[in-house]
Amino acid sequence: MHESTILSAGSTNPFNRIVSAVMLALIELYRRWISPLIGPRCRFIPTCSAYGIEAIQRHGPWRGGWLTLRRLLRCHPFTPCGCDPVPD
């Protein structure tokens, strides 16, 4: 992960940069170690982890984290599959 991709939302606040880095590291941890064990389960395109990375990079840790949480809550067997991109 390069520092330039940690926050594309333009924040220079060091705290936000740290929070973003931690959130992105947790997503990478999930992708590398947990996801291979449980297999593909996401009902959307892009996957929830890819969505989370993009949302945090584009909108910063707070709005990006909120969008990611909302997406995770929508990803269950009773929701129809489909394309759900990160909003602008």
Curated annotation (Swiss-Prot):
InterPro entries to which the protein is assigned, alphabetical: Membr_insert_effic_factor_YidD
Subcellular compartments: Cell inner membrane
Superkingdom in the source lineage: Bacteria
Predominant location: membrane
Disulfide bonds: none
Keyword annotations of the record: Cell inner membrane, Cell membrane, Membrane
Pfam families found in the cross-reference section: YidD
GO CC aspect terms: plasma membrane
Membrane topology: Peripheral membrane protein
PANTHER family: MEMBRANE PROTEIN INSERTION EFFICIENCY FACTOR-RELATED
Family listed: Belongs to the UPF0161 family.
Function (record text): Could be involved in insertion of integral membrane proteins into the membrane.
Annotated protein name in UniProt: Putative membrane protein insertion efficiency factor
Source species: Synechococcus sp. (strain CC9311)
Lineage of the species this protein comes from: Bacteria, Bacillati, Cyanobacteriota, Cyanophyceae, Synechococcales
